[in-house]
């Protein structure tokens, strides 16, 4: 699940930390969602963490705490699609089930010179048929892992290492001198700008944060420095001031850039004073530096947290 849309080298430290904390389906099922999100903090795509916890509940309730070895059953688990099912069944249970990820698509598209949109439609189906046809019944997990590793280490998106590739002489894209034209995908959606304002509110060494509602389009259930969106940075700041009933210092403390899929998020960070007689709003919490380890923040707000900790240490 962690490897969905994330490279192995990025996942490894998270995986090791996760397995130390939640080594079984039972421990994951019993863990509070806040702890699960905290362990996932920084890895992104937090829906995967929620799906994994939901899958743990299903494994405990329907499969007696054991991961099913049947493809139909395993595909019922939240967050498990054909790619994850193939990887789990072939690697963990030695079942001859194909795996198709971005690396496999790239390798096959170049070797067999497959054109078209390979993430959907006829091209995608052709890739899956090839993966199924070529998959050996002996050690299918090793084959799938080797194929994915091939794409990750040799058949790279740019500057592929064709000189050491064992299939160079059979690669049609290489023979045609068009290796850079494969694979071809549908045009990516244009990047959209998102303007946000966040505020740093401190009181006696603690910082005010709040939990994002489940209705949020991003970062639902994670903690954040109070923030708001707008059509511009100025409007975002104005919206946040109105929401909190506060006035910000005019000088911007920092400007944080963050990318979420095809959205470029720009967060302007401001500072505001907290009146001692004022009551803390519902859903907000004062957090001291020693308690940060209890709260999961999205990566963009982790940058703000580092900034506040660095400033407080000076």
Regions found by a protein language model. Name each.
Residues 149-314:
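Intrinsically disordered, low-complexity, charged terminal extensions of DNA damage-control enzymes
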Residues 1-163, 167-176, 180, 193, ...:
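Catalytic cores of DNA base-excision repair glycosylases
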């Amino acid at each position: 699940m962690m490897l969905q849309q994330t490279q192995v080298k990025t996942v490894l430290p998270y995986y090791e930390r996760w397995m130390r904390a939640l080594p079984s389906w039972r421990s994951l099922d019993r863990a509070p969602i806040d702890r699960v999100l905290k362990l996932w903090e920084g890895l992104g795509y937090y829906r995967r963490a929620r799906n994994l916890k939901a899958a743990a509940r299903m494994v405990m309730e329907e499969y007696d705490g054991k991961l099913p070895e049947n493809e139909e059953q395993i595909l019922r688990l939240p967050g498990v699609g054909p790619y994850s099912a193939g990887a789990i069944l072939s690697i963990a249970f030695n079942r001859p089930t194909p795996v198709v990820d971005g690396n496999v698509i790239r390798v096959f598209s170049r070797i067999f010179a497959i054109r078209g949109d390979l993430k959907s439609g006829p091209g995608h189906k052709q890739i899956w048929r090839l993966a199924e046809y070529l998959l050996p019944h002996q050690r299918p997990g090793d084959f799938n892992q080797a194929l994915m590793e091939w794409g990750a280490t040799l058949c790279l998106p740019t500057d592929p290492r064709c000189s050491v590739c064992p299939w160079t002489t059979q690669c049609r894209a290489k023979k045609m001198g068009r290796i850079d034209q494969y694979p071809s995908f549908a045009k990516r959606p244009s990047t959209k700008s998102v303007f946000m304002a966040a505020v740093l509110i401190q009181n006696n060494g603690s910082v005010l944060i709040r939990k994002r509602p489940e209705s949020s389009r991003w970062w639902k259930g994670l903690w954040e420095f109070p923030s708001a969106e707008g059509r511009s940075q100025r409007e975002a700041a104005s919206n946040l001031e109105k929401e909190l009933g506060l006035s910000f210092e005019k000088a911007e403390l920092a400007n944080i850039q963050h990318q979420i899929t095809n959205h470029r998020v720009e967060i302007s960070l401001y500072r505001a004073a907290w009146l001692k007689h004022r009551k803390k709003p519902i859903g907000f919490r004062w957090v001291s530096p020693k308690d940060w380890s209890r709260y999961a923040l999205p990566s963009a707000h982790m940058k703000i947290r580092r900034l506040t900790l660095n400033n407080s240490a000076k």
